[in-house]
Amino acid sequence: TPKCMIRLDFGKPTQEKEQAFAHIPRTPPTLTELLCQIIMKLSDFKHAIARFFGKCKREDTMPNIQDYVIWRGDLPLDRVPLCDVDALLLSYLSYMPYDHIAGDAFDEGISLRDAAQKLLEVNERDKTPLAYNVREDRKLLAALMESARFRDIRLVGYVNKVDPEQEEQFAAVTYLLGEGRAFVAFRGTDNTVVGWKEDFNMSFETEVPAQRDAVAYAQHVAKAIDLPLIVGGHSKGGNLAAYAGMFVDEATRARIQTVYNFDGPGFNEATISSEEFGKVDMRIRTFVPQSSMIGILMWHREPFTIVRSNGVGVFQHDAYTWQIMGGDFIKLSERTGHSHFADDTIKRWLEELKPDMRRQAIDGIYAVLSASDGMNVSDLFEARNTMSVLKAAGAMDEKTRSAVLEAFRLLGSSMIGGVPAWLERTASSVAQKMPWEQRREEARAEAKIEARAEAKTEAKTEAKAETRLEAGMEAKARENAPELAK
C-alpha cells in the first residue's frame, strides 16, 4: 500500500515524493513496520557483506595462497612433494562449481588448467559465482592456469548433492597429483540453507548424511584408483575428511597417508573417544587461524597448528587471509582471547542445552527459514522471502517458540559465564605487552643468560680442579713407584 511504500522508502525525500504522498497521515510506525524497515534496509545484505569483507583485513598483509601459486608454480609436484599449503589450496578449490565441467567418472578427467579456463569463461559469460570471493577466485584460477605445479593435475570423481528432504549438502572431488598419489577433497558448507542446517544438526546427531556419504565416497575412490590417498577439506569439509578417515574400512584406511582439517569443526565426545578415532588421530593435521571461531567448535583431541591470518574475527575463516612465508604457513604459538572466549561459550552452551532441546530449537528455526522460496542464505534477505520468514516466525507454535527462546537464553548465559575467564586472559595478554613487563622479561632473560654463563664458568673451574687433582695423584704415584717396586 502507499503507506507501506513511504514507510519502506529509504531514499532521500524529494519534492515529488512529498507531493505524491502528502494526503497520507504520518503516524508513528508499529513494531512490525519498524522490523520491516530494518530488514528491508538489509535486503542487499550479500553485497554489503562483500563490501565489508573487502575492508576486514589488516594492513600487515603477507603472501597468501595466490602469491604461493605464483612463487612455487615453477616446481612440479614430482620435484617438490605436496606440502600443507598445497593441501589448503586443493581443499579450497573444491568449492568451485565444477558442475558440467568435471564428471563423476574416475577413468576420465579434466586438467586443472582446462577446468580453470572453463570456470572463468562461464563466470564471464553468465556472471555466475565461483567459490566465495569472485574477484580473488578469478586471480587464483588465472595463476593456476600458468602454474607448472598445478595446471596438469587431473580432476576426477566430482559429485555435488543438495537434498532438502534429507537435510544434506555434500560435494567432493579427487585430484590425481601426477606424482603417484591422489588427493580427495571434501567441500565445506556452501551458501545453501540446507548446508547450514546440516552443520547445526551435527550438534545433536551422532552422524549426519554428509558424513555417511564422505565414508562411502572415500571407499569408492579407493576401489577406483590404486594409489596412496590424502584426504582433506576446509570448514565442514575438514570434518568430513576426518570422519571418513575414521570410519572407512581397514584396507582403505591403510592407504590414507594424511588427513587435513583446515578450520573444520570437531566431533561430539563419543566420536573422539571411539576406537576408530584412535586408529587415525596421529594422521590428522588440523590447522586453525589465531582467532578461529569455526574450527574450535565441538570437541577435538588432536593438536592444532595455529596459522597467522590478516582477517578480522570470523573472517579469518577465509583461506585467502591465511599468511604464508615461502613454502609454509606463518605459525603462531597461541590463539587469541576472542577464540578462547568463543570456544568456552559454545562448549558451555552445548553442555547446558540438552540434545532434544537443540534439535527442537534448530528444527524450529529451519522451518521458519524454509517458509521462503530462497534456497541460498543470501536469498533470505530479499524482500518477498523476508516477509515469508516473518509470517512463519509469527505462526510458530508455543512449544517450539519456548525452545528457541530457551536456547538463546542459555547462549546469553554462557557468554556471560565466559566473561571472567576472557577478562583474565585479556588482562594477562595486555600486561605482557606493557613496557615494564617487557623490561621485566628482558631482565629475566638476562638473568638466565648470566646464570648459564656462571654455571659454565663453575663447570670449567671444577673440571680444571679435577684435572689438577688427577695430575697430582699421577705425579705422586710416579714418585712412589720405586718404593712400591722394592
Question: In which residue ranges do the predicted regions lie?
Answer:
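Alpha/beta hydrolase fold serine-hydrolase catalytic domain that processes acyl esters and thioesters
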Residues: 60-85, 90-172, 177-182, 186-201, ...
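Extreme N-terminal basic, low-complexity initiation segments
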Residues: 2-9
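Short hydrophobic alpha-helical segments enriched in small aliphatic residues
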Residues: 11, 22-24, 48
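Gly/Ala-rich beta-loop-alpha elbow adjacent to hydrolase catalytic centers
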Residues: 233-237, 241
